[in-house]
């Protein structure tokens, strides 16, 4: 299972991730990396994706997937991918651009930058990162960086997980992804968590945090085992 971090201005480091350990305890190799766009490797590395989401970051992630696919303990024909927030964005971007993964779970994702501009609590800072303005000023640029534009070609079974009180990536982002996948004829499900914010995986109600993990594992088991 390829795990992609959120942010994108965050990074993976030497700390305990209960989610990774949970999947590993159920028989999966969990692998992760820090692509361009995140922190920890200098300003040039961090700003490499500004104005080009889905460009250098996607390239780095695919190179890492290539590397892992050559490992003797990895079955390259049974690879899954998941992530939340920016990691959810990249998960949808990946399944819209390659069919190499056999299963995907996109969590609290960005799906459409155009509609999100008017509904998210951080559209003001995103304009800075995207080097864009409003949709009226930068429609083509925002649309071209939106995963939903490319979901019509995907073949990857994809589970959508979203939280109904998410103000960062509003629920309509998950709804758009689900509808696009259904129209493409892809195997998909939409899991909605009521009352939960963007940070369900960290601060959500305990039973719902457990349910989220079980939904991811269920989906991966269905297509990878």
Language model segments and positions:
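Active-site-proximal cap/loop segments of hydrolase catalytic domains
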Residues: 3, 10, 17-20, 24-25, ...
């Amino acid at each position: 299972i390829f795990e992609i971090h959120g942010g994108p201005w965050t990074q993976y480091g030497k700390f305990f991730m209960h989610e990774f350990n949970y999947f590993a305890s159920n028989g999966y190799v969990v692998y992760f990396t820090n692509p361009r766009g995140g922190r920890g490797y200098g300003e040039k590395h961090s700003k490499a994706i500004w104005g080009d989401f889905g460009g250098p970051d996607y390239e780095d992630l695919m190179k890492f997937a290539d590397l892992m696919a050559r490992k003797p303990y990895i079955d390259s024909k049974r690879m899954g991918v998941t992530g939340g927030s920016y990691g959810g964005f990249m998960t949808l971007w990946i399944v819209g651009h390659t069919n190499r993964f056999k299963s995907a779970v996109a969590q609290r994702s960005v799906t459409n930058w155009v509609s999100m501009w008017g509904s998210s609590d951080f559209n003001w800072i995103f304009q800075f990162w995207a080097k864009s303005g409003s949709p009226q000023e930068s429609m083509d640029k925002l649309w071209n960086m939106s995963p939903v534009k490319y979901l019509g070609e995907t073949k990857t079974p994809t589970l959508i997980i979203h939280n109904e009180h998410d103000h960062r990536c509003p629920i309509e982002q998950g709804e758009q992804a689900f509808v696009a996948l259904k129209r493409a004829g892809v195997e998909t499900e939409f899991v909605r968590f009521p009352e939960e914010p963007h940070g369900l995986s960290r601060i959500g109600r305990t039973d719902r945090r457990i349910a989220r993990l079980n939904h991811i594992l269920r989906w991966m088991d269905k297509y990878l085992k």
